[in-house]
Amino acid sequence: MTQRFGKVGVLYGGRSAEREVSLMSGAGVHEALRSAGVDAHLFDTGLQDLTALEAAGFERVFIALHGRFGEDGAIQGALELLNIPYTGSGVTASALAMDKIMTKRVWLQHGLPTPAFEEIDSDTELRRVPDRLGLPLILKPPHEGSTVGITKVAACADMEQAYAAASHFDEVVLAEQFVRGRELTVALLGSGRNARALPVIEIVAPDGNYDYQNKYFTDVTQYFCPADLPVGVAEQIEKIAVQAYRALGCEGWGRADFILDGQNQPWLLEMNTSPGMTSHSLVPMAARAVGMSYAELCVAILADASCKLRAPARANG
């Protein structure tokens, strides 16, 4: 079965702030694919030029890149030009999901629940933002993941420092209403009508601090899969996750992050189109809950690889 994939490149590393995580994800995916009999080879896009992909004879690639130049549509566009099938979402969906502000706008247009927010920049009167969104609130760069540059602001006096941390990555920053509740995530597989949600995972971090360190480098965070939720609530969250995925045009696989408030109302936070695939990562955990091994998951994602753009038909004459 795996022989039909031909020579496969596992794109990892890259140049984003999430390079370290991507190196771990790529190494895991590479090992899993090799164990399944796939002719897989690592390719660090931060060290090698993409034109080398074509020269190396890769017939498809597994994108294990995170953040800028990996899940923002840039690498996807290059692969379309090279006509090399790739995993995950296409150019447009990747770019949309990478921009948390645009993502929230799309979700609101589709009637999906997401916390109130504002765009802020260097001209914004920062101390007035809490008047509209309340305290605490969240400041985050809209084009980063893995909690990079995120600050929970507890007082007006902290706004400038929090903005400085986020604006180090993006000039325009997302200010978001803080919703107190349970942190949940839903992995998704497939595309279009075939998109499906895997069981909901609950994340319980020390003092509620699910930061970069606790995500990837400690064992103090607890995960519950499936999450201990009333059946109706779990089904509602999975349904919203699929709707959010489809609204953005996502394909292949992804992960939707939620907060569940005290009234069991789920709130969408963001969509990841190239989620982590490390030993601590959540998509492999959800797959295990439905009897899918890590290697089987990687092969299933790879099997869905494709070029998404279609060349227009040539006019006669």
UniProtKB/Swiss-Prot annotation:
SUPFAM superfamilies under this entry?
Answer: Glutathione synthetase ATP-binding domain-like, PreATP-grasp domain
GO molecular function terms listed in the Swiss-Prot or TrEMBL record:
ATP binding; D-alanine-D-alanine ligase activity; metal ion binding
How many and how are cofactors bound here? Binds 2 magnesium or manganese ions per subunit.
Q: Name one Pfam family in it.
A: Dala_Dala_lig_N
Q: Which GO terms describe its biological process?
A: cell wall organization; peptidoglycan biosynthetic process; regulation of cell shape
Name any cofactors this protein relies on: Mg(2+); Mn(2+)
Report the domain of life of the source organism. Bacteria
What the entry lists under InterPro entries is as follows: ATP-grasp, ATP_grasp_subdomain_1, D-Ala_lig_Van_CS, D_ala_D_ala, Dala_Dala_lig_C, Dala_Dala_lig_N, PreATP-grasp_dom_sf
Residues reported in the UniProt entry to bind ATP = 130-185
Enzyme class, top EC level, equals ligase
Q: Which UniProt keywords apply?
A: ATP-binding, Cell shape, Cell wall biogenesis/degradation, Cytoplasm, Ligase, Magnesium, Manganese, Metal-binding, Nucleotide-binding, Peptidoglycan synthesis
Q: What is its EC number?
A: 6.3.2.4
Disulphide bonds annotated for this chain are none
Q: Where in the cell is it found?
A: Cytoplasm
Residues binding Mg(2+) 1 are 257, 270
- ATP-grasp domain: from which residue to which, for each copy? 104-303
Q: Binding positions for Mg(2+) 2?
A: 270, 272
Q: In which pathway does it act?
A: Cell wall biogenesis; peptidoglycan biosynthesis
* GO cellular component labels: cytosol
The record's listing under PANTHER family reads:
D-ALANINE--D-ALANINE LIGASE, D-ALANINE--D-ALANINE LIGASE B
| Family to which this protein belongs | Belongs to the D-alanine--D-alanine ligase family.
Please explain the role this protein plays, according to its UniProt record. Answer: Cell wall formation.
State the name under which the record lists this protein: D-alanine--D-alanine ligase
Kindly list the organism's lineage.
Bacteria, Pseudomonadati, Pseudomonadota, Betaproteobacteria, Burkholderiales
